[in-house]
């Protein structure tokens, strides 16, 4: 009787898990619930496998932040999503990008700023700005260093062991938006031997939250971030780096900040073949806008030429 009860419970769990998976236009999802980690708070990991996934082939890997927002708008808090399966699926079907899988790393909503705010920038900020950001934005202790370390030392080894990947840097990428864009470029700078490129959509270049942006906070925090990039960006034209922004809602803040970052990219010697900054008129700080243009950075990172 206990054996049958255990079987029923197991089957029920599997059915519930399947019901909670995103509905997809292309491919399939394998979910690891509460991935075991010593570095950050456990979270779900969604692994997207393309149509006709073949275990005898090897695949590039794209790590994407805010994983619960990637695939199915009916499952997200704001009923919008990136529709990443649609974008990747169509590009793969047309033979325009390398064979790849997506590893969607869920955020922990109350930890999102702590995980995504580049930690070495926080460490360099003076008082009282530092305390203000820690209290009102981070809401505790920063954890970005552990978050990127988690990806590199715990999650990536697991993915490379359990899926047929191409583990080298030139086949390993990160994509994120807003704060997810910040942690993507930070991860590349901290682990240049692990990642071959990043795409930072609507990167939150002021760093401070919109509620905290004032003349002093803005000047110090964004300036410290640019100082960090000056010192830590990988050698020019060894990695692919993509930035973009719109001009509506939150994105309306970004042009002056991004212009200063672009000057750094030029001064470091990055050329248009491996670095892009694009502006999108009429686009906003939303998953709807990111979904509309996701094919552009994906083609940039994974083009099959």
Task: Walk through the language-model features, giving the residues of each.
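Bacterial Sec-dependent N-terminal signal peptides
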Residues: 1-23
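Non-catalytic cap/lid and distal C-terminal segments of serine-dependent acyl enzymes
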Residues: 19-305
């Amino acid at each position: 009787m206990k054996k049958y009860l255990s079987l029923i419970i197991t089957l029920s769990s599997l059915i519930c898990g399947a019901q909670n998976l995103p509905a997809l236009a292309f491919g399939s999802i394998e979910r690891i619930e509460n991935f075991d980690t010593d570095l950050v708070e456990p979270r779900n990991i969604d692994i997207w496998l393309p149509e006709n996934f073949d275990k005898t082939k090897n695949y590039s890997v794209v790590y994407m932040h805010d994983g619960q927002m990637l695939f199915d708008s009916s499952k997200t808090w704001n009923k919008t999503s990136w529709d990443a399966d649609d974008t990747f699926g169509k590009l793969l079907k047309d033979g325009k990008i390398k064979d790849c899988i997506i590893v969607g790393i869920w955020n922990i909503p109350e930890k999102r700023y702590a995980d995504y705010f580049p930690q070495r920038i926080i460490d360099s900020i003076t008082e009282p700005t530092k305390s203000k950001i820690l209290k009102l934005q981070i809401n505790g202790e920063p954890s970005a260093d552990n978050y990127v370390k988690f990806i590199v030392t715990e999650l990536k080894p697991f993915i490379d062991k359990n899926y047929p990947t191409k583990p080298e840097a030139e086949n390993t990428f990160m994509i994120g938006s807003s704060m997810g864009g910040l942690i993507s470029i930070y991860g590349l700078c901290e682990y240049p031997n692990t990642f071959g490129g990043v795409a930072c959509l609507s990167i939150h270049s002021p760093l401070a939250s919109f509620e905290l942006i004032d003349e002093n906070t803005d000047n110090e925090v964004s300036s410290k971030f640019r100082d960090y990039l000056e010192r830590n960006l990988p050698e020019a034209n060894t990695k692919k780096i993509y930035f973009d922004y719109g001009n509506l809602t939150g994105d309306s803040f970004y042009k002056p900040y991004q212009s200063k970052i672009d000057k750094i990219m030029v001064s470091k010697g990055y050329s248009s073949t491996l670095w892009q900054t694009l502006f999108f008129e009429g686009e906003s700080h939303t998953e709807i806008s990111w979904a509309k243009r996701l094919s552009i950075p994906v083609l940039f990172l994974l083009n099959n030429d």
